[in-house]
């Protein structure tokens, strides 16, 4: 953890020198709880995607933005649909074809334009177009037709 904190501190200083706000995505291929580190850097914007539904009902630091990941997988689908109905958290959904205007009653925005999820309006679906192997994924529930 000390290395991560050192890297964030160095990045923060570089961003300050450049006059830009630092933004860090710690969980790219994981879903690790970094809340203690995030709290140490209140002037840094942190953001992640997650499938951990418990985070939807927790009080998060104001500098931490989560976008939940949709899946139609049995057992998870009902939970993520509940998040969509009960909270204003954004949910990322991968679509096989063109992005629809709405999904599950929410406006769909084009999430492929950039990865700055913390700049998105609340209560939206972050639409992503299927790429690579996902285009041929017809069984996992990850891609919506």
Feature-to-residue mapping (PLM):
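Class I S-adenosyl-L-methionine
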Residues: 1-145
């Amino acid at each position: 953890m000390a290395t991560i904190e050192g890297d964030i501190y160095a990045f923060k200083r570089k961003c300050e020198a450049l006059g830009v706000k630092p933004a860090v995505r710690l969980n790219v291929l994981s879903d690790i709880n970094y809340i203690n580190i995030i709290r140490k850097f209140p002037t840094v914007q942190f953001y992640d995607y997650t499938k951990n539904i418990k985070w939807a009902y927790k009080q998060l630091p104001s500098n931490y933005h989560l976008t939940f990941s949709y899946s139609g997988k049995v057992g998870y689908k009902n939970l993520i649909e509940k998040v969509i109905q009960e909270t204003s958290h954004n949910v990322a959904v991968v679509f096989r074809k063109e992005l629809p205007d709405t999904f599950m009653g929410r406006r769909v925005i084009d999430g492929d334009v950039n990865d700055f999820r913390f700049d998105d309006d609340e209560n939206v679906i972050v639409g992503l177009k299927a790429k690579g192997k996902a285009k041929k994924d017809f069984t996992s529930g990850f891609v919506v037709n």
